[in-house]
UniProtKB/Swiss-Prot annotation:
One of its GO terms (cellular component) is cytosol. The MATH/TRAF domain binds to receptor cytoplasmic domains. A zinc finger (RING-type) spans 45-85. PANTHER family: TNF RECEPTOR ASSOCIATED FACTOR (PTHR10131), TNF RECEPTOR-ASSOCIATED FACTOR 5 (PTHR10131:SF83). SUPFAM superfamilies: RING/U-box, TRAF domain-like. This is TNF receptor-associated factor 5. One of its GO terms (molecular function) is ubiquitin protein ligase binding. It is found in: Cytoplasm; Cytoplasm, Cytosol. Homotrimer. Heterotrimer with TRAF3. Associates with TNFRSF5/CD40 through interaction with TRAF3. Associates with LTBR/TNFRSF3, TNFRSF4, TNFRSF8/CD30, TNFRSF11A/RANK, TNFRSF13B/TACI, TNFRSF14, TNFRSF17, TNFRSF19/TROY, RIPK2, MAP3K14, MAP3K5, and TRAF and TNF receptor associated protein TDP2. Interacts (via C-terminus) with EIF2AK2/PKR (via the kinase catalytic domain).
Length: 558
Protein backbone atom coordinates (compact mmCIF):
# COMPACT_ATOMS: atom_id res chain seq x y z
CA UNK A 1 0.00 0.00 0.00
CA UNK A 2 1.78 3.06 -1.25
CA UNK A 3 1.48 6.56 0.20
CA UNK A 4 2.80 9.74 -1.39
CA UNK A 5 6.06 11.32 -0.19
CA UNK A 6 4.08 14.16 1.35
CA UNK A 7 2.16 11.68 3.47
CA UNK A 8 5.35 9.83 4.44
CA UNK A 9 6.72 13.00 6.02
CA UNK A 10 3.73 13.35 8.40
CA UNK A 11 4.41 11.12 11.40
CA UNK A 12 0.93 10.96 12.87
CA UNK A 13 -1.39 12.42 10.26
CA UNK A 14 -4.43 10.20 9.79
CA UNK A 15 -4.69 9.11 6.19
CA UNK A 16 -6.54 6.49 4.18
CA UNK A 17 -4.79 3.39 2.92
CA UNK A 18 -4.16 3.46 -0.85
CA UNK A 19 -4.74 7.22 -0.88
CA UNK A 20 -2.18 9.24 -2.82
CA UNK A 21 -4.08 12.58 -2.98
CA UNK A 22 -5.34 13.11 0.59
CA UNK A 23 -4.65 16.60 2.05
CA UNK A 24 -3.73 17.05 5.74
CA UNK A 25 -2.84 20.22 7.65
CA UNK A 26 0.84 19.83 8.52
CA UNK A 27 4.26 21.12 7.54
CA UNK A 28 7.85 19.91 7.23
CA UNK A 29 9.91 20.45 10.41
CA UNK A 30 13.57 21.49 10.21
CA UNK A 31 12.75 23.88 7.35
CA UNK A 32 13.27 27.65 7.24
CA UNK A 33 9.99 29.53 6.74
CA UNK A 34 9.60 33.26 6.04
CA UNK A 35 6.63 34.35 8.14
CA UNK A 36 4.53 37.34 7.07
CA UNK A 37 4.60 38.63 10.64
CA UNK A 38 7.50 38.07 13.01
CA UNK A 39 7.16 34.69 14.73
CA UNK A 40 6.10 35.17 18.35
CA UNK A 41 8.09 33.43 21.08
CA UNK A 42 5.03 31.47 22.19
CA UNK A 43 5.07 29.69 18.84
CA UNK A 44 8.72 28.65 19.18
CA UNK A 45 9.91 25.36 20.68
CA UNK A 46 11.65 25.84 24.04
CA UNK A 47 14.24 23.24 23.01
CA UNK A 48 15.06 23.75 19.31
CA UNK A 49 13.74 27.36 19.11
CA UNK A 50 12.12 26.63 15.74
CA UNK A 51 8.44 26.91 14.97
CA UNK A 52 6.48 24.34 17.01
CA UNK A 53 5.72 21.09 15.19
CA UNK A 54 2.94 19.01 16.83
CA UNK A 55 3.29 21.08 20.06
CA UNK A 56 3.14 19.45 23.50
CA UNK A 57 2.83 21.47 26.72
CA UNK A 58 4.53 20.52 29.99
CA UNK A 59 3.26 21.01 33.51
CA UNK A 60 5.38 24.16 33.85
CA UNK A 61 3.55 25.71 30.88
CA UNK A 62 6.27 25.60 28.23
CA UNK A 63 5.75 24.19 24.77
CA UNK A 64 7.95 21.75 22.86
CA UNK A 65 7.84 19.98 19.50
CA UNK A 66 6.62 16.41 19.76
CA UNK A 67 10.02 15.08 18.65
CA UNK A 68 11.88 17.44 20.99
CA UNK A 69 9.94 16.34 24.08
CA UNK A 70 10.62 12.73 23.11
CA UNK A 71 14.33 13.50 22.70
CA UNK A 72 14.45 15.13 26.15
CA UNK A 73 12.86 12.04 27.70
CA UNK A 74 15.16 9.65 25.84
CA UNK A 75 18.38 11.58 26.59
CA UNK A 76 17.68 12.03 30.31
CA UNK A 77 16.18 9.64 32.80
CA UNK A 78 14.81 12.73 34.58
CA UNK A 79 14.07 15.30 31.85
CA UNK A 80 14.53 18.96 32.84
CA UNK A 81 12.80 21.93 31.22
CA UNK A 82 15.59 24.07 29.64
CA UNK A 83 13.66 27.28 30.42
CA UNK A 84 12.90 27.07 34.15
CA UNK A 85 14.88 23.90 35.04
CA UNK A 86 11.72 22.26 36.36
CA UNK A 87 11.43 18.46 36.19
CA UNK A 88 9.23 17.42 33.28
CA UNK A 89 6.72 14.85 34.52
CA UNK A 90 5.46 12.57 31.72
CA UNK A 91 1.94 12.43 33.16
CA UNK A 92 1.69 16.24 32.97
CA UNK A 93 2.73 16.43 29.29
CA UNK A 94 -0.21 16.78 26.89
CA UNK A 95 -0.72 17.55 23.22
CA UNK A 96 -1.56 21.24 22.79
CA UNK A 97 -4.07 21.08 19.92
CA UNK A 98 -5.11 24.70 20.39
CA UNK A 99 -1.53 25.89 19.86
CA UNK A 100 -1.16 23.47 16.95
CA UNK A 101 -4.15 25.04 15.18
CA UNK A 102 -2.74 28.53 15.75
CA UNK A 103 0.68 27.53 14.37
CA UNK A 104 -0.83 25.84 11.31
CA UNK A 105 -2.81 29.03 10.57
CA UNK A 106 0.22 31.36 10.67
CA UNK A 107 0.81 33.04 7.30
CA UNK A 108 4.11 32.51 5.50
CA UNK A 109 5.55 33.60 2.17
CA UNK A 110 6.13 31.07 -0.56
CA UNK A 111 9.76 29.92 -0.62
CA UNK A 112 9.82 30.82 -4.33
CA UNK A 113 9.45 34.56 -3.61
CA UNK A 114 9.85 37.10 -5.12
CA UNK A 115 8.74 35.20 -8.23
CA UNK A 116 5.72 33.89 -6.35
CA UNK A 117 4.08 36.49 -4.12
CA UNK A 118 1.60 34.07 -2.55
CA UNK A 119 0.96 34.14 1.18
CA UNK A 120 -0.39 30.89 2.58
CA UNK A 121 -1.04 29.40 5.98
CA UNK A 122 1.74 27.16 7.27
CA UNK A 123 -0.47 24.07 7.28
CA UNK A 124 -1.05 24.43 3.53
CA UNK A 125 2.57 25.24 2.65
CA UNK A 126 3.34 21.83 1.13
CA UNK A 127 0.00 21.78 -0.70
CA UNK A 128 0.82 25.18 -2.23
CA UNK A 129 4.21 23.94 -3.46
CA UNK A 130 2.45 21.13 -5.33
CA UNK A 131 0.78 23.80 -7.49
CA UNK A 132 3.15 26.81 -7.29
CA UNK A 133 4.04 28.09 -10.77
CA UNK A 134 7.54 29.09 -9.59
CA UNK A 135 8.42 25.74 -8.00
CA UNK A 136 11.39 24.00 -9.65
CA UNK A 137 10.28 20.69 -11.17
CA UNK A 138 11.91 18.18 -13.52
CA UNK A 139 10.72 17.67 -17.07
CA UNK A 140 7.92 15.03 -17.13
CA UNK A 141 9.83 13.12 -19.80
CA UNK A 142 11.94 10.58 -17.88
CA UNK A 143 14.67 10.69 -20.54
CA UNK A 144 15.03 14.47 -20.14
CA UNK A 145 14.46 15.40 -16.44
CA UNK A 146 15.76 18.94 -17.08
CA UNK A 147 14.89 21.26 -14.16
CA UNK A 148 12.62 24.27 -14.78
CA UNK A 149 9.84 26.30 -13.20
CA UNK A 150 6.41 24.68 -13.25
CA UNK A 151 5.04 27.57 -15.31
CA UNK A 152 7.59 26.85 -18.05
CA UNK A 153 6.85 23.12 -18.37
CA UNK A 154 4.20 23.48 -21.07
CA UNK A 155 6.40 25.68 -23.27
CA UNK A 156 9.39 23.39 -22.69
CA UNK A 157 7.39 20.31 -23.73
CA UNK A 158 6.02 21.97 -26.84
CA UNK A 159 9.17 23.68 -28.14
CA UNK A 160 12.45 22.89 -26.38
CA UNK A 161 12.46 19.39 -24.88
CA UNK A 162 14.77 17.15 -26.89
CA UNK A 163 12.62 14.19 -25.94
CA UNK A 164 9.24 15.68 -26.88
CA UNK A 165 7.13 13.78 -29.37
CA UNK A 166 6.06 15.13 -32.76
CA UNK A 167 3.95 13.54 -35.48
CA UNK A 168 5.81 12.02 -38.40
CA UNK A 169 4.82 13.85 -41.60
CA UNK A 170 4.39 10.55 -43.43
CA UNK A 171 2.96 7.89 -41.08
CA UNK A 172 1.42 10.37 -38.59
CA UNK A 173 2.80 8.45 -35.59
CA UNK A 174 4.14 10.30 -32.50
CA UNK A 175 7.95 10.04 -32.56
CA UNK A 176 10.59 11.50 -30.17
CA UNK A 177 12.17 14.49 -31.93
CA UNK A 178 15.74 13.18 -31.58
CA UNK A 179 14.68 9.93 -33.28
CA UNK A 180 12.55 11.51 -36.01
CA UNK A 181 15.25 11.62 -38.73
CA UNK A 182 16.36 8.04 -38.05
CA UNK A 183 12.71 6.95 -38.07
CA UNK A 184 12.11 8.52 -41.48
CA UNK A 185 15.31 7.20 -43.03
CA UNK A 186 15.11 3.63 -41.70
CA UNK A 187 11.74 2.51 -40.38
CA UNK A 188 8.85 4.80 -41.39
CA UNK A 189 6.48 2.59 -43.44
CA UNK A 190 5.03 5.58 -45.33
CA UNK A 191 8.33 7.34 -46.14
CA UNK A 192 8.78 7.64 -49.96
CA UNK A 193 11.80 5.68 -51.26
CA UNK A 194 13.24 5.04 -54.71
CA UNK A 195 12.67 1.74 -56.47
CA UNK A 196 15.60 -0.69 -55.87
CA UNK A 197 15.56 -1.35 -59.64
CA UNK A 198 16.05 2.39 -60.30
CA UNK A 199 12.85 2.89 -62.21
CA UNK A 200 11.39 6.38 -62.26
CA UNK A 201 8.81 5.74 -59.52
CA UNK A 202 9.03 6.54 -55.78
CA UNK A 203 6.85 4.42 -53.50
CA UNK A 204 6.13 4.17 -49.74
CA UNK A 205 8.63 1.91 -47.97
CA UNK A 206 5.91 -0.56 -46.91
CA UNK A 207 4.82 -1.10 -50.55
CA UNK A 208 8.24 -1.77 -52.09
CA UNK A 209 7.71 -5.54 -52.31
CA UNK A 210 4.31 -5.02 -53.90
CA UNK A 211 5.84 -2.65 -56.46
CA UNK A 212 8.59 -5.15 -57.37
CA UNK A 213 5.93 -7.55 -58.67
CA UNK A 214 4.97 -5.03 -61.39
CA UNK A 215 8.16 -2.95 -61.79
CA UNK A 216 9.16 -2.85 -65.51
CA UNK A 217 12.87 -2.73 -64.53
CA UNK A 218 12.71 -5.87 -62.36
CA UNK A 219 14.78 -8.86 -63.53
CA UNK A 220 12.80 -12.09 -64.00
CA UNK A 221 12.94 -15.44 -65.83
CA UNK A 222 11.18 -16.18 -69.11
CA UNK A 223 7.69 -17.68 -68.51
CA UNK A 224 8.86 -20.75 -70.53
CA UNK A 225 11.69 -21.49 -68.08
CA UNK A 226 9.96 -24.70 -66.99
CA UNK A 227 10.10 -25.91 -70.59
CA UNK A 228 13.85 -25.23 -70.90
CA UNK A 229 14.18 -21.53 -71.92
CA UNK A 230 17.16 -19.98 -70.11
CA UNK A 231 16.58 -16.31 -71.03
CA UNK A 232 16.44 -13.82 -68.10
CA UNK A 233 15.79 -10.08 -68.49
CA UNK A 234 13.80 -7.04 -67.45
CA UNK A 235 10.03 -7.40 -67.30
CA UNK A 236 9.54 -4.80 -70.05
CA UNK A 237 11.93 -6.63 -72.47
CA UNK A 238 10.53 -10.13 -71.90
CA UNK A 239 7.38 -9.40 -73.92
CA UNK A 240 9.54 -8.70 -76.98
CA UNK A 241 11.51 -11.92 -76.30
CA UNK A 242 8.28 -13.96 -76.15
CA UNK A 243 7.18 -12.64 -79.56
CA UNK A 244 10.59 -13.19 -81.18
CA UNK A 245 11.15 -16.70 -79.77
CA UNK A 246 7.62 -18.04 -80.25
CA UNK A 247 8.73 -20.89 -82.58
CA UNK A 248 11.53 -21.95 -80.22
CA UNK A 249 9.12 -21.92 -77.28
CA UNK A 250 6.64 -24.14 -79.19
CA UNK A 251 9.39 -26.67 -79.96
CA UNK A 252 10.33 -26.74 -76.27
CA UNK A 253 6.68 -27.32 -75.32
CA UNK A 254 6.33 -30.17 -77.88
CA UNK A 255 9.51 -31.82 -76.61
CA UNK A 256 8.28 -31.55 -73.03
CA UNK A 257 4.91 -32.99 -74.07
CA UNK A 258 6.61 -35.98 -75.78
CA UNK A 259 8.63 -36.65 -72.62
CA UNK A 260 5.43 -36.59 -70.55
CA UNK A 261 3.70 -39.07 -72.90
CA UNK A 262 6.67 -41.44 -72.59
CA UNK A 263 6.52 -41.09 -68.83
CA UNK A 264 2.80 -41.84 -68.75
CA UNK A 265 3.30 -44.97 -70.90
CA UNK A 266 5.99 -46.23 -68.52
CA UNK A 267 3.71 -45.56 -65.55
CA UNK A 268 0.86 -47.57 -67.13
CA UNK A 269 3.14 -50.56 -67.60
CA UNK A 270 4.38 -50.30 -64.03
CA UNK A 271 0.79 -50.03 -62.79
CA UNK A 272 -0.25 -53.23 -64.62
CA UNK A 273 2.66 -55.09 -63.05
CA UNK A 274 1.72 -53.82 -59.59
CA UNK A 275 -1.95 -54.83 -60.05
CA UNK A 276 -0.84 -58.36 -60.95
CA UNK A 277 1.33 -58.47 -57.85
CA UNK A 278 -1.56 -57.20 -55.70
CA UNK A 279 -3.83 -60.02 -56.96
CA UNK A 280 -1.19 -62.59 -56.06
CA UNK A 281 -0.84 -61.10 -52.58
CA UNK A 282 -4.64 -61.06 -52.13
CA UNK A 283 -4.84 -64.78 -52.92
CA UNK A 284 -2.03 -65.46 -50.45
CA UNK A 285 -3.87 -63.47 -47.76
CA UNK A 286 -7.08 -65.45 -48.34
CA UNK A 287 -5.12 -68.69 -47.99
CA UNK A 288 -3.58 -67.51 -44.71
CA UNK A 289 -7.00 -66.39 -43.40
CA UNK A 290 -8.44 -69.83 -44.13
CA UNK A 291 -5.56 -71.54 -42.30
CA UNK A 292 -5.93 -69.11 -39.38
CA UNK A 293 -9.63 -69.93 -39.11
CA UNK A 294 -8.81 -73.64 -38.97
CA UNK A 295 -6.21 -73.05 -36.26
CA UNK A 296 -8.74 -70.98 -34.28
CA UNK A 297 -11.35 -73.73 -34.43
CA UNK A 298 -8.76 -76.31 -33.42
CA UNK A 299 -7.65 -74.11 -30.52
CA UNK A 300 -11.28 -73.73 -29.40
CA UNK A 301 -11.79 -77.48 -29.41
CA UNK A 302 -8.56 -77.96 -27.49
CA UNK A 303 -9.67 -75.36 -24.93
CA UNK A 304 -13.02 -77.08 -24.45
CA UNK A 305 -11.29 -80.42 -24.11
CA UNK A 306 -8.88 -78.97 -21.53
CA UNK A 307 -11.71 -77.47 -19.44
CA UNK A 308 -13.57 -80.79 -19.59
CA UNK A 309 -10.45 -82.60 -18.42
CA UNK A 310 -10.06 -80.14 -15.54
CA UNK A 311 -13.72 -80.50 -14.57
CA UNK A 312 -13.46 -84.26 -14.82
CA UNK A 313 -10.41 -84.23 -12.57
CA UNK A 314 -12.31 -82.09 -10.05
CA UNK A 315 -15.35 -84.38 -10.20
CA UNK A 316 -13.09 -87.42 -9.82
CA UNK A 317 -11.65 -85.96 -6.61
CA UNK A 318 -15.14 -85.12 -5.32
CA UNK A 319 -16.41 -88.60 -6.28
CA UNK A 320 -13.57 -90.25 -4.38
CA UNK A 321 -14.36 -88.10 -1.33
CA UNK A 322 -18.10 -88.83 -1.57
CA UNK A 323 -17.38 -92.53 -2.04
CA UNK A 324 -15.36 -92.55 1.17
CA UNK A 325 -18.16 -90.68 2.99
CA UNK A 326 -20.76 -93.18 1.71
CA UNK A 327 -18.66 -96.09 2.89
CA UNK A 328 -18.48 -94.56 6.36
CA UNK A 329 -22.26 -93.96 6.37
CA UNK A 330 -22.91 -97.55 5.27
CA UNK A 331 -20.71 -98.83 8.05
CA UNK A 332 -22.60 -96.69 10.55
CA UNK A 333 -25.94 -97.82 9.12
CA UNK A 334 -24.92 -101.45 9.27
CA UNK A 335 -23.64 -101.09 12.80
CA UNK A 336 -26.47 -98.92 14.23
CA UNK A 337 -29.57 -99.30 12.05
CA UNK A 338 -31.95 -98.41 14.83
CA UNK A 339 -30.29 -95.09 15.83
CA UNK A 340 -29.65 -93.42 12.44
CA UNK A 341 -32.25 -90.99 11.17
CA UNK A 342 -31.39 -89.49 7.74
CA UNK A 343 -34.34 -87.12 7.77
CA UNK A 344 -32.54 -84.69 10.04
CA UNK A 345 -29.60 -84.65 7.61
CA UNK A 346 -31.92 -83.90 4.68
CA UNK A 347 -33.58 -81.11 6.67
CA UNK A 348 -30.17 -79.64 7.50
CA UNK A 349 -29.19 -79.67 3.82
CA UNK A 350 -32.46 -77.91 2.87
CA UNK A 351 -31.87 -75.32 5.59
CA UNK A 352 -28.38 -74.63 4.26
CA UNK A 353 -29.77 -74.20 0.71
CA UNK A 354 -32.35 -71.66 1.96
CA UNK A 355 -29.65 -69.79 3.85
CA UNK A 356 -27.49 -69.62 0.71
CA UNK A 357 -30.48 -68.24 -1.25
CA UNK A 358 -31.04 -65.56 1.43
CA UNK A 359 -27.36 -64.57 1.38
CA UNK A 360 -27.43 -64.20 -2.42
CA UNK A 361 -30.45 -61.90 -2.10
CA UNK A 362 -28.66 -59.94 0.64
CA UNK A 363 -25.80 -59.08 -1.76
CA UNK A 364 -28.15 -56.92 -3.85
CA UNK A 365 -29.49 -55.22 -0.73
CA UNK A 366 -25.91 -54.53 0.43
CA UNK A 367 -25.18 -52.73 -2.86
CA UNK A 368 -28.23 -50.48 -2.30
CA UNK A 369 -27.25 -49.87 1.32
CA UNK A 370 -23.71 -48.88 0.26
CA UNK A 371 -25.17 -46.25 -2.08
CA UNK A 372 -27.41 -44.89 0.70
CA UNK A 373 -24.43 -44.84 3.09
CA UNK A 374 -22.38 -42.76 0.61
CA UNK A 375 -25.24 -40.23 0.37
CA UNK A 376 -25.50 -40.03 4.18
CA UNK A 377 -21.71 -39.52 4.46
CA UNK A 378 -21.93 -36.59 2.02
CA UNK A 379 -24.76 -35.02 4.06
CA UNK A 380 -22.81 -35.54 7.29
CA UNK A 381 -19.77 -33.73 5.79
CA UNK A 382 -22.01 -30.80 4.78
CA UNK A 383 -23.44 -30.62 8.32
CA UNK A 384 -19.93 -30.79 9.82
CA UNK A 385 -18.82 -27.83 7.67
CA UNK A 386 -21.90 -25.85 8.73
CA UNK A 387 -21.27 -26.71 12.40
CA UNK A 388 -17.66 -25.50 12.11
CA UNK A 389 -18.89 -22.28 10.51
CA UNK A 390 -21.48 -21.79 13.28
CA UNK A 391 -18.86 -22.52 15.95
CA UNK A 392 -16.59 -19.82 14.49
CA UNK A 393 -19.58 -17.46 14.40
CA UNK A 394 -20.41 -18.21 18.06
CA UNK A 395 -16.78 -17.53 19.06
CA UNK A 396 -16.96 -14.11 17.39
CA UNK A 397 -20.30 -13.31 19.03
CA UNK A 398 -19.06 -14.53 22.42
CA UNK A 399 -16.09 -12.12 22.32
CA UNK A 400 -18.02 -9.24 20.71
CA UNK A 401 -18.36 -5.92 22.51
CA UNK A 402 -21.39 -3.64 21.99
CA UNK A 403 -20.20 -0.49 23.77
CA UNK A 404 -18.07 0.99 20.98
CA UNK A 405 -14.85 -0.09 22.72
CA UNK A 406 -12.41 -2.86 21.80
CA UNK A 407 -9.56 -4.26 23.89
CA UNK A 408 -7.50 -6.31 21.44
CA UNK A 409 -4.98 -8.78 22.88
CA UNK A 410 -2.22 -9.52 20.35
CA UNK A 411 -0.29 -12.62 21.48
CA UNK A 412 2.92 -14.18 20.09
CA UNK A 413 4.17 -10.77 18.95
CA UNK A 414 7.65 -11.93 17.85
CA UNK A 415 6.30 -14.81 15.72
CA UNK A 416 3.64 -12.65 14.06
CA UNK A 417 6.10 -9.83 13.39
CA UNK A 418 8.57 -12.28 11.80
CA UNK A 419 5.75 -13.60 9.56
CA UNK A 420 5.02 -9.99 8.56
CA UNK A 421 8.71 -9.31 7.78
CA UNK A 422 8.90 -12.46 5.64
CA UNK A 423 5.70 -11.47 3.80
CA UNK A 424 3.64 -14.49 4.90
CA UNK A 425 1.03 -12.60 6.98
CA UNK A 426 1.63 -8.86 6.64
CA UNK A 427 -1.40 -7.79 8.72
CA UNK A 428 -3.73 -9.13 11.42
CA UNK A 429 -7.40 -8.27 12.12
CA UNK A 430 -9.11 -7.98 15.49
CA UNK A 431 -12.45 -9.55 16.33
CA UNK A 432 -15.44 -7.36 15.32
CA UNK A 433 -17.00 -4.97 17.86
CA UNK A 434 -20.14 -2.80 17.73
CA UNK A 435 -21.31 0.64 18.82
CA UNK A 436 -24.52 -0.98 20.14
CA UNK A 437 -26.53 -4.17 19.75
CA UNK A 438 -27.85 -2.90 16.41
CA UNK A 439 -25.03 -0.46 15.70
CA UNK A 440 -22.05 -0.14 13.39
CA UNK A 441 -19.88 -3.27 12.93
CA UNK A 442 -16.19 -2.34 13.26
CA UNK A 443 -12.72 -3.87 13.71
CA UNK A 444 -9.04 -2.94 13.88
CA UNK A 445 -6.19 -3.92 11.54
CA UNK A 446 -2.51 -3.92 12.54
CA UNK A 447 0.63 -4.18 10.41
CA UNK A 448 3.28 -5.35 12.90
CA UNK A 449 6.11 -4.59 10.43
CA UNK A 450 4.52 -1.35 9.27
CA UNK A 451 2.64 -0.25 6.17
CA UNK A 452 3.25 2.54 3.64
CA UNK A 453 5.50 5.24 5.10
CA UNK A 454 5.93 3.21 8.30
CA UNK A 455 6.97 -0.07 6.67
CA UNK A 456 9.96 -1.65 8.40
CA UNK A 457 10.17 1.03 11.11
CA UNK A 458 6.76 1.36 12.77
CA UNK A 459 3.67 -0.55 13.84
CA UNK A 460 0.78 0.67 11.67
CA UNK A 461 -2.73 0.70 13.19
CA UNK A 462 -5.94 1.20 11.21
CA UNK A 463 -9.66 1.43 11.90
CA UNK A 464 -12.05 -0.53 9.63
CA UNK A 465 -15.80 -0.14 9.02
CA UNK A 466 -17.30 -3.58 8.27
CA UNK A 467 -20.60 -4.62 6.70
CA UNK A 468 -23.21 -5.29 9.43
CA UNK A 469 -26.69 -6.73 9.64
CA UNK A 470 -28.34 -3.40 10.50
CA UNK A 471 -26.54 -1.09 8.02
CA UNK A 472 -29.79 -0.16 6.25
CA UNK A 473 -31.10 1.36 9.53
CA UNK A 474 -27.95 3.38 10.36
CA UNK A 475 -26.88 6.87 9.31
CA UNK A 476 -24.17 7.05 6.62
CA UNK A 477 -21.43 8.05 6.24
CA UNK A 478 -19.91 7.11 9.61
CA UNK A 479 -19.01 10.41 11.36
CA UNK A 480 -17.85 9.52 14.90
CA UNK A 481 -14.53 10.39 16.58
CA UNK A 482 -12.19 7.39 16.92
CA UNK A 483 -9.33 6.92 19.41
CA UNK A 484 -6.50 4.42 18.82
CA UNK A 485 -4.38 3.42 21.85
CA UNK A 486 -1.38 1.24 22.68
CA UNK A 487 -1.82 0.35 26.36
CA UNK A 488 1.06 0.60 28.85
CA UNK A 489 1.19 -2.63 30.90
CA UNK A 490 3.26 -1.12 33.74
CA UNK A 491 0.24 0.42 35.45
CA UNK A 492 1.60 3.96 34.92
CA UNK A 493 -0.92 4.59 32.14
CA UNK A 494 1.77 5.95 29.82
CA UNK A 495 -0.41 4.98 26.86
CA UNK A 496 0.27 6.03 23.27
CA UNK A 497 -2.90 7.71 22.00
CA UNK A 498 -3.99 9.06 18.63
CA UNK A 499 -7.47 10.46 17.89
CA UNK A 500 -9.17 11.41 14.64
CA UNK A 501 -12.65 12.24 13.43
CA UNK A 502 -14.09 10.29 10.52
CA UNK A 503 -14.07 12.23 7.25
CA UNK A 504 -17.60 12.00 5.75
CA UNK A 505 -16.14 12.57 2.25
CA UNK A 506 -13.84 9.55 2.49
CA UNK A 507 -14.94 6.23 1.00
CA UNK A 508 -13.48 4.58 4.13
CA UNK A 509 -16.57 5.68 6.07
CA UNK A 510 -19.34 5.16 3.52
CA UNK A 511 -21.77 2.26 3.80
CA UNK A 512 -19.71 -0.85 2.90
CA UNK A 513 -20.35 -2.44 -0.50
CA UNK A 514 -18.19 -5.48 0.27
CA UNK A 515 -17.22 -7.27 3.48
CA UNK A 516 -15.32 -4.17 4.70
CA UNK A 517 -14.21 -0.68 3.61
CA UNK A 518 -10.65 0.52 2.99
CA UNK A 519 -8.92 0.90 6.37
CA UNK A 520 -8.14 4.37 7.72
CA UNK A 521 -5.67 5.23 10.45
CA UNK A 522 -2.01 5.83 11.26
CA UNK A 523 0.76 4.15 9.22
CA UNK A 524 3.37 5.42 11.74
CA UNK A 525 1.41 4.80 14.96
CA UNK A 526 4.42 3.78 17.09
CA UNK A 527 8.03 3.13 16.15
CA UNK A 528 9.55 -0.31 16.69
CA UNK A 529 12.32 1.30 18.78
CA UNK A 530 9.73 2.71 21.22
CA UNK A 531 7.48 -0.35 21.18
CA UNK A 532 10.26 -2.91 21.73
CA UNK A 533 12.41 -0.82 24.11
CA UNK A 534 13.04 -2.87 27.26
CA UNK A 535 12.57 0.30 29.36
CA UNK A 536 8.96 0.48 28.22
CA UNK A 537 6.30 -2.09 29.08
CA UNK A 538 4.14 -1.98 25.99
CA UNK A 539 5.06 -5.63 25.34
CA UNK A 540 4.88 -8.07 28.24
CA UNK A 541 5.07 -11.88 27.98
CA UNK A 542 5.28 -11.44 24.18
CA UNK A 543 1.81 -9.83 24.26
CA UNK A 544 0.59 -6.29 23.59
CA UNK A 545 -2.82 -4.70 24.08
CA UNK A 546 -4.43 -2.30 21.59
CA UNK A 547 -7.56 -0.33 22.35
CA UNK A 548 -10.02 1.25 19.93
CA UNK A 549 -12.73 3.55 21.32
CA UNK A 550 -15.55 5.19 19.35
CA UNK A 551 -17.11 8.40 20.70
CA UNK A 552 -20.84 7.61 20.92
CA UNK A 553 -21.87 11.25 21.46
CA UNK A 554 -24.85 12.28 19.29
CA UNK A 555 -25.12 8.68 18.06
CA UNK A 556 -28.78 7.68 17.94
CA UNK A 557 -29.46 4.21 19.39
CA UNK A 558 -31.97 2.07 17.52
Amino acid sequence: MAHSEEQAAVPCAFIRQNSGNSISLDFEPDTEYQFVEQLEERYKCAFCHSVLHNPHQTGCGHRFCQQCIRSLRELNSVPICPVDKEVIKPQEVFKDNCCKREVLNLHVYCKNAPGCNARIILGRFQDHLQHCSFQAVPCPNESCREAMLRKDVKEHLSAYCRFREEKCLYCKRDIVVTNLQDHEENSCPAYPVSCPNRCVQTIPRARVNEHLTVCPEAEQDCPFKHYGCTVKGKRGNLLEHERAALQDHMLLVLEKNYQLEQRISDLYQSLEQKESKIQQLAETVKKFEKELKQFTQMFGRNGTFLSNVQALTSHTDKSAWLEAQVRQLLQIVNQQPSRLDLRSLVDAVDSVKQRITQLEASDQRLVLLEGETSKHDAHINIHKAQLNKNEERFKQLEGACYSGKLIWKVTDYRVKKREAVEGHTVSVFSQPFYTSRCGYRLCARAYLNGDGSGKGTHLSLYFVVMRGEFDSLLQWPFRQRVTLMLLDQSGKKNHIVETFKADPNSSSFKRPDGEMNIASGCPRFVSHSTLENSKNTYIKDDTLFLKVAVDLTDLEDL
